[in-house]
Amino acid sequence: MVAEQGTPKRLHFDFVGAVLWLVRILAILAVVIGAFVSLTSGRLSAAAWLNFVVIGIGQGAIYALIALGYTMVYGVLGFINFAHGEVFMSGAMVGAFAANSLAQAGMWNSSPILSILIVLLIAMATSTLVALLLERVAYRRLRNAPRLIPLITSIGASFFIQYAFLGLFGAQTRTYPALSILDGFISVAGLNIRYADIMVIGAAVVMMVGLYTFVERTKAGRALRAVAEDKEIAALMGVNVNRTIVLTFAVGGAMAGAAALLFGVVFRTVFFFSGFLFGIKAFTAAVLGGIGNIVGAMLGGLTLGIFESVGPSLVLTGLGIPSAHQLKDVVAFLALVLVLIFKPTGLLGERLSEERA
């Protein structure tokens, strides 16, 4: 069959792709212009910028610990547990109650290390228990359901936990008592580092290294990775899939509980809705690092924390936007949008198969 000579070829124009490229270019220009104006204005010293970075690392460490729960559950079960922010909130709320009880008993500042360890164990135990209840009651029967079903269930579970804690603790804000040993800062080459940031960063690093070692070096960790790779083959190899899934929720809950204590010690206030905002930010961190990748969650949390701390002064102020630091939450959510536009797989993520997506 001979093709007709005079038939013109149809040109296909990808309108959505063109818009995305335009958004990419505008975003890069905005960041470059804002950063250039801020850095050349001399408004802040180098030490001030470094202070922003240190504060961002401290915040990012908390995001990273919470993000681990999102990424571990996704890696094993393939769905996003949007109730994980409330797992974090439950540990923070009960931790505040425990911390105030210790303060009334005179232990909080007289024996600060012991008090922190006690509240840490209580917060981790609470968050772990809530995570295990979620797995048992809300998700276990939905393991073979379409991915949309457990996703919707997790949103419902999130609201249920929020209002359960509203009924238990009321709508008022709970405050952690001040910890005298964390007052003040240390000066290093003109850089003022708060003791609270040192504690948060140090504790988070220890826990993240411990988790990485657990996943990579232990038999239970190898089982977890095997189930994440393929449940059926893992079961044929003798791995107890059900127990491994329960362990995944338990570990994610424990990390969220640890983050809850660090959050309480640094920010000091918590209420029944606190888990929503921090949960969304931690989810953003997981996506930024590559959802399903444990190291990616850690890296994503730290990156988001620094971006949220430095971004308003570096970019927004340079663009002439007033009260830039009041927009740090906007910066965090903007980061999620930009990641989804520029690199949907995240920093360390891999392109998903159709089955997992």
Report each predicted region and the residues it spans.
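Transmembrane helix-bundle core of multi-pass membrane transporters
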Residues: F13-D14, R141-R217, T244, V310-D329, ...
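Membrane-embedded helix boundary and interhelical linker motif in transport proteins
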Residues: V54, V76-L133, T269, S313-I321
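Transmembrane alpha-helical segments in multi-pass inner-membrane proteins
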Residues: Y63, G69, I116-M124, V246-A256, ...
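Alpha-helical transmembrane segments within multi-pass membrane transporters and channels
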Residues: G106-A157, A164, L299-L304, E308, ...
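Helix-loop-helix "hairpin" substructures at the membrane interface of multi-pass membrane proteins
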Residues: Q59, N192-F271, I294-G300
